[in-house]
Amino acid sequence: MPLYEHVFLARQDASSQQVEELTTQITGVITGLGGKVTKTENWGVRSLTYRMKKNRKAHFVLLNIDGPATIVNEIERQERIHEDVIRYLTVRVDEHEDGPSAMMRKADRDRERDDRGGGFRGDRGPRRPREEPAAVVEE
């Protein structure tokens, strides 16, 4: 069966519990039509590049799907109807990535940077006083 990566964006006003319910609803549709969800990742609330339907932020969710094309048609139809879904995108892939997706790796990398101390530079001493410019002597 073909493999798909499906990402949908839910309104920021929706609680994380509502997003989880929406994810389980979509997963139920997929399994009901003979497919299976191999991986589900909730990327959390992220800022959007531009406003979509009066929203500046959204919940991002990734689903790796293994199933026929009729599944994609049905979940996209249901997401078009659902008021909490802002956008969705389904891409056919040759194979699914093992381990975390690129977005999750980026989030882990950002957390590691925060562990390094952020912007605190306590090891540096105080600033040196500015030197006065040399006096110009005119003859």
UniProtKB/Swiss-Prot annotation:
Task: Specify where the region named Disordered lies, as residue ranges.
Answer: 97-139
Q: Which GO terms describe its biological process?
A: translation
- Specify residue ranges for compositional bias: Basic and acidic residues: 97-133
Q: Does the keyword Ubl conjugation apply?
A: no
Query: Has UniProt tagged this entry with the keyword rRNA-binding?
Result: yes
| One Pfam family this sequence matches | Ribosomal_S6
The record's Gene Ontology cellular component field reads: cytosolic small ribosomal subunit
Please give the InterPro entries that the UniProt record associates with this protein: Ribosomal_bS6, Ribosomal_bS6_sf, Ribosomal_S6_plastid/chlpt, Transl_elong_EF1B/ribsomal_bS6
**TM region positions:** none
Which family, according to UniProt? Answer: Belongs to the bacterial ribosomal protein bS6 family.
Q: What is this protein called?
A: Small ribosomal subunit protein bS6
Species in which this protein is naturally found: Nitrobacter winogradskyi (strain ATCC 25391 / DSM 10237 / CIP 104748 / NCIMB 11846 / Nb-255)
